[in-house]
Design a protein with these regions (language model features):
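ATP/NTP-dependent adenylation/nucleotidyl-transfer catalytic domains that generate, transfer
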Residues: 2-3, 58, 87-90, 103-104, ...
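ATP-dependent adenylation/nucleotidyltransferase module used to activate substrates
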Residues: 1-142, 171, 230-231
Length: 235
């Protein structure tokens, strides 16, 4: 059994990768989010990312990366390998972004870390169907308004929404999984969650060509009691 960390954004692809890693028998020891100094993620708010890790019962590591970023990543990964006795890294990457090679694979190679990419170049339709089959609840946390209307922000990726999204992607020629930045998601429930999270009061904000969910000042995403969960889940 190999010891691995999962590179965690909090989105649907990271959650699917988590499911596949456990299914493959890897020992998942922590979730790691790489970030620049003083990070502010519009698509993946850090307070919610931390709550996800709490719900999953896993340590969350916020790893600061300094420039030059190639060397910064390698130094950070080397520290993680030593501190956590790692054999490998799991990512939710589906494809190259903008034609660029797989960044993490290049950074891990000189360190002797195996990179597991269970979603790599899979059918988008199959991946979205797998998300539903595993009862992963994901919401569009950020959309590129040049591709999707701002009203998509905050929508839950349920069966009906996915049909609409895939039809639109086929017609307009964009990636149905959002791999090229068309949209981002945040997961509020799924396999391993002690209880669902909810996004009460979150609002849609705008910045340049992005529409994104923002947390009300002074509030945190709350966990719903397992007794009030809409479905039973095997843990």
């Amino acid at each position: 059994m190999s010891r691995v960390i999962l590179l965690w954004s909090g989105g649907k692809d990271a959650m699917l990768a988590l499911c596949h890693a456990r299914q493959a028998g890897h020992q998942l020891v922590a979730l790691a989010t790489f970030a620049p100094p003083e990070p502010r993620f519009l698509a993946h708010p850090l307070p919610l990312v931390r709550r996800q890790a709490e719900a999953l019962g896993l340590p969350h590591l916020l790893v600061t990366i300094e420039a030059p970023f190639d060397l910064g990543y390698e130094r950070a990964l080397a520290r993680l390998k030593e501190e956590w006795q790692l054999d490998g890294v799991v990512t939710g990457d589906i494809d190259s972004v903008g034609g660029a090679p797989n960044w993490i694979r290049e950074r891990c190679q000189p360190l002797g870390l195996t990179v597991h990419t269970p979603l790599w170049q899979q059918s988008r339709q199959a991946l979205l169907a797998d998300m539903l089959a595993r009862s992963i609840v994901a919401h569009l946390s950020c959309v590129d308004t040049r591709v999707l209307a701002p009203e998509w922000t905050g929508r839950t990726l349920d069966a009906a929404t996915l049909v609409e999204l895939q039809q639109l992607a086929e017609r307009e020629g964009f990636d149905a999984c959002g791999e090229q930045g068309e949209y981002h998601t945040m997961v509020t429930d799924g396999p391993g969650f002690a209880a669902p999270l909810r996004l009460d009061g979150w609002q849609v904000a705008r910045q340049d060509h992005l529409a994104y969910l923002t947390e009300p000042q002074g509030q945190r995403p709350q966990a719903i009691s397992p007794a009030h969960s809409a479905r039973e889940k095997s843990r």
